[in-house]
A protein has these predicted regions:
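Glycine-rich FAD pyrophosphate-binding loop
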Residues: 42-65
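Flavin-dependent oxidoreductases
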Residues: 36, 195-293, 297-308, 319
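Helical element adjacent to the flavin cofactor pocket in flavoenzyme catalytic cores
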Residues: 158-221, 381
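Short beta-strand to alpha-helix junction loop
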Residues: 77-88, 112-121, 159-177, 187, ...
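C-terminal catalytic lobe of FAD-dependent flavoproteins
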Residues: 308, 312-391
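Dinucleotide-binding Rossmann-like beta1-alpha1 core, especially the glycine-rich loop
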Residues: 68-143, 147, 154, 280
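N-terminal mitochondrial targeting presequence
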Residues: 1-22
Length: 391
């Protein structure tokens, strides 16, 4: 387990109620985005960087409980941060991380249409991809049947060759190595319990508590909130009540598939307009094992058993998968794992919600990164560049 020097040294102060350490930059949250930001800003030798993580290891929540897809950047409004930073992040992953040994594969993706309405949707995505200069192409039906005989696509197949898969842990471990090679630190098992801003000192004080009851007060000139599911909660510790945000949680269950029909690429159904997910899709891991998900299940709170797969969702997922993979058998599917999407809007709100990455008025040096759901893993290095430019 990777632990920072801060955590190890703080345990030496067993008789003291507080330990104080100063950094130029403090990042809250050691998921894919927090580690990427920590790595990026640590490249400046004038920066002393600390990344704080409440769990005992980095990347234990949304960053590792997802489809592990390198997204092309096709689905979101052209002028959105999701589109801009997904495309940039994809390029950085392929250009930088692949050369450094991060485990990944450029397997490509098909989006399949089963009716006229879905065909029109694919045409719009294809036109948008031209505007974004992201490669897509329609696959002739005879060629599609030759390449993937198990897949049903009654009306059309849109190919996205720049889509891939990546080991989230391999990617995060690479970012952590960059951070630590630049003398940055990761503090695990350290939950943020309070935030204050000193106008006179022009610095932030971060109150941190460990599982064994040890407390620390850490100061930093710049504070970056990348707490994922808990980002609104962290932001609300600092901002006045009228600027508080509510967190919403959209659970996604994944189901593993027993067998190997030889499918070689990711298969996505056409998304349903106004629904907060891309549909129950077919993804592959780096070993070629198939899985299906995520579905969409709204949960009210993050309970201890929130990550337990909801087996009641197996048959609905099976029915969705059958639409594009008709030979799938129910007995070949079983619950695998689940993840939680950090949402800033609830189930009843249908409009698009972009990433929220911004400076906060009245709090110089404080940057919020909230609502970082899909394509957050792909966009993580793009987000890091964006945040670095905000500083």
């Amino acid at each position: 387990m990777l632990r920072s020097r801060l955590i190890r040294s703080s345990r030496l102060f067993s008789t003291s109620s507080q330990v104080r350490a100063d950094f130029t930059h403090i990042v809250i949250g050691a998921g894919a985005v927090g580690l990427a930001i920590g790595a990026e800003i640590s490249k400046d030798p004038n920066h002393s960087v600390l990344v704080i993580e409440k769990n005992e290891e980095h990347g234990q929540e949304t960053s590792s409980r997802n489809s592990e897809v390198i997204h092309a950047g096709l689905y979101y409004p052209v002028d959105s941060l999701k589109t801009e930073l997904c495309i940039l992040g994809k390029q950085l992953i392929y250009n930088e991380c692949e050369a450094m040994g991060v485990e990944m594969k450029r397997c490509g993706k098909w989006i399949v249409a089963q009716n006229e309405l879905q065909l029109e949707y694919l045409k719009k995505i294809h036109e948008k991809s031209k505007q974004l200069q992201v490669e897509t192409s329609f696959v002739p039906s005879n060629k599609a049947k030759e390449l993937e005989p198990s897949i049903r696509a009654d009306y059309a197949v849109l190919n996205s060759p720049t889509t891939g898969i990546v080991s989230a842990h391999s990617l995060m471990n690479y970012q952590l190595s960059v951070l630590q090679n630049n003398d940055g630190q990761l503090a695990v098992g350290s939950e943020v319990v309070g935030l204050t801003y000193s106008e006179g000192m022009k610095e932030y004080e971060v109150d941190v508590s460990s599982e064994d009851g040890e407390n620390m007060s850490i100061s930093g000139n710049v504070l970056i909130n990348c707490a994922g599911l808990y980002a609104p909660q962290v932001s609300n510790m600092l901002l006045p009540e009228e600027r508080h945000l509510k967190a919403y949680y959209a659970k996604g269950n994944y189901f593993s598939f027993q067998g190997n029909p030889g499918i070689r690429r990711l298969i996505y159904p056409c998304p349903t307009p106004g629904v907060a997910s891309l549909g129950t899709h077919l993804t592959l891991d780096l070993g070629g094992q198939m899985k299906f998900g995520p579905d969409l299940e709204w949960v009210d709170e993050l309970t201890e058993d929130v990550y337990k797969v909801n087996d009641q969702n197996l048959i609905p997922a099976y029915n969705e998968v059958r639409k594009y993979f008709p030979s799938v058998q129910l007995e070949n599917l079983s619950g695998s794992y689940s993840g939680i999407r950090p949402k800033l809007i609830g189930e009843d709100v249908k409009e698009f919600q972009d990433f929220v990455i911004r400076k906060e008025d009245g709090y110089p040096g404080f940057i919020n990164c909230m609502g970082i759901e899909s394509p957050g893993l792909t966009a993580s290095m793009g987000i890091a560049k964006y945040v670095s430019n905000l500083l």
